[in-house]
Amino acid sequence: MNKKEKYRIKFAEALQNEKLKLTSQRSAIFDEVIYGEKHRECEEICDSLKKKNHNASRATVYRTLDILIKYDFVRKMDIGDGRIRYESKIGHPHHDHMICVETGKIIEFVSDEIENIQEEIAEKHGYKIIKHIHQLFVKPIKK
């Protein structure tokens, strides 16, 4: 059994926990969100599904996204512009984001140094980090 099949089984189990069935619509939404482009709004996901001739209502997409978030398949992103974006957590190790306030471009980055500093700060105050969200809002340097 490959990784994709394992994730689909886990998704089916999550749906079962929610007393829902794995329909062709939910399966298409799962594939689109998990294996499609990153950092997309619900509307972009709906548009992509329509282009692929998948008939899923916006309500079904939102409900499925909520389940994907609840069961840790997907991360919900608020980058401060009033629009929520979604990003798969499957196959994407922890990373942070830089968001350009002029263009909206989202740049992913990893810094072991920043991670270590955050852990040291938490420990210094008697805590252990269980999760964090690190977003840098940036502007291009004008030369």
Predicted features, each with a name:
Residues 70-143:
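Non-DNA-binding regulatory cores of transcription-related proteins
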